[in-house]
Amino acid sequence: MHSLYTTSLAYPHVPTNSVAVCDLALSFGEGSDGDRKKRMSRPFGVALLLAGYDELEGCQLFFSDPSGTFVRYKAKAIGAGSEGAQSNLEESYSESLTLSEAQDLALSTLKQVMEEKISTDNIELARVTPDKGFHIATKEEITEALGRL
């Protein structure tokens, strides 16, 4: 993860280049840490969602499975309860959703599949937008969003 972070941070300082989100996902999937001998080995044995924005493709979401395979999605659920959550996302997601509506869909999906009551103590919420970049919601922002459900 540190390698992806430092790679993405370096690109703003290169005037004519920007890192594509799919390139970061590929780098993670290859297990690339700069050592070519280690490429294509099983990276970390974890599932990961990688979200980002680049000038070429806009907002993107990639899923990397424990083997390092990555796939691009519009909406994706991983972890406990992911089958039910993914079904709900496939039925309800639309590219015409506003950011607020997409956030509400994510939270209502979590509410449906989580065993314990959804609260600011057991969820995190983040978003990636072209104008504001990456933002992790504060507890106050999450409380406000949960109030809309």
PLM regions with names:
Residues 1-149:
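Long, low-complexity N-terminal extensions
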